Amino acid sequence: VLYHSIYPAENNSKKWICFVHGAGGNSSIWFNQVRFFKTYFNVLLIDLRGHGKSEVSPEGTEYTFNIIIDDILNVLDENKIKKSHFVGISLGSILIQKMLQNHSNRVEKIGLGGAILNLNPQSRFLMLMGKLTQSILPFIWIYTFFAYVIMPYKAHRKSRALFIKEAKKISHNEFKRWYRLTATILPVLKRIRDKEMRTPILYIMGSHDYMFLPFVKKIVALHRSSSLITVANSGHVVNIDQPEEFNSQLLSFLLSD
């Protein structure tokens, strides 16, 4: 079972909220959310495979989205959590939406920051560049370059620095495994866009998230169960750039009927 942390609800609520980080991060990126949300919900933080305090998989193990989602479900089962709200950032947003399609009975509401629904030409070029250089360059150079392209502005300095710092804790082999997983991402994203689910989804996107915000706007215009809040002066990692706004908007959504 993946490494995970539980913070019981201070109001004795039976409701759960599960936070899923992105590639290269770990559950420490939710430090601004834990104290706030444990007032209202039981909080579950998960470290994905090879991230944070979760174990590295044996040599030769290849990842698929279904394997990673099963990891998350195993944590829920271990703690007898039948249903939970889910909150994800970046790659975590893809995992949660993929899980919703296959296991909608485990999901209440969804809040997504830095949500990835498609890849624009710049992000596709980045993916190709990473693929061509991952066997030549230290992965942290590639990751750092990605971080500066995705989060380029001064307002993103804190989130950019945290992600680079946490990514340094991942092994090179683990980075390559997750990178190979992203090669399968386009058909997964197409299915997410094409198949609207009834579960309420709130996208909380930074106004500077230029690579991914346009696609979210398009989907919200088409999917009736989805809504969007754009947070000013914030980039891809909106929960770190503007934590108070992120928390208050997400809480209002989760508590609404």
Regions of interest found by a model, annotated:
Residues 35, 44-87, 91, 248:
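Active-site loop/oxyanion-hole signature of alpha/beta-hydrolase fold enzymes
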Residues 197, 203-205:
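Short beta-strand/loop motif that positions the catalytic acidic residue
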